[in-house]
Amino acid sequence: IKTDSGGQGSGAYEKDELQWTQYPNECHIAIFGDQTLNSHKVITTDKISYAAGRNRSQYYQMNWLADDGYVYVFSPSYAKTMSDSRQQTTLPAGVVRIDTKAEEFDAAYYYNLEEKANGASFLRTWYISGNYFLLLMYDRPFSETGYTANQLAVFKAGSEKLTYVSGLPSTDIISGFGNTLHVENGKAYIAATTTDGNPAI
């Protein structure tokens, strides 16, 4: 609990406040009525933790409108890394979806991504097309030290399959992936950087 107000930007906090997330075992989504942002409703699910990828001061998009009309909401369960037990989530990394017509979470839809990734989570997500999403995966669970996001996997909504991408350089030499995904003719392109050569797609 903070004894004084302080911080800046997303790190700002008020006196007597528990900084950062107050509800680690819930995900809250605001749905705005139009582009003026004057009216909105908030919907909540307790199936996943908050839907935001984190890397230091960077926040990454986790909500994507797919061709089937649903908004898929991914949570990497980053709150597992919090030092204060009151801010740690007990929920695994997973995905839920929002019915855009009802403007509510689809109560029947939930997929445990962490279970299919041997306990690992993900740093980023991108929408490809159809029911396909690309995930930048960590190499080990948050409970272990030295976890690094150096693998890619494709999640297919509908069949709920998580498939790791093969044919990439060894994870020992991958130093990063591009920020932007390019999709053309059903194929997704992303830059990969290695420690022993120039970036490649």
PLM regions and their residue ranges:
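Long, well-ordered mid-to-C-terminal structural blocks that present hydrophobic/aromatic surfaces
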Residues: 73-146
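C-terminal structured domain segments
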Residues: 162-201
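Structural signature of eukaryotic scaffold interfaces centered on beta-propeller domains
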Residues: 1-4, 56-71, 77-80, 119-132, ...
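Short loop/turn segments that connect beta-strands within the blades of beta-propeller domains
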Residues: 25, 67, 91, 129, ...
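Membrane-embedded hairpin module used as a gating/binding unit in multi-pass transport
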Residues: 25-28, 46-100
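Long, acidic/polar, low-complexity amphipathic helices and coiled-coil-like
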Residues: 1-66
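Surface-exposed loop and turn segments in beta-propeller and other repeat-based domains
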Residues: 36-59, 101-122, 158, 163-175
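Beta-propeller blade signature
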Residues: 9-38, 86-103, 148-160, 200-201
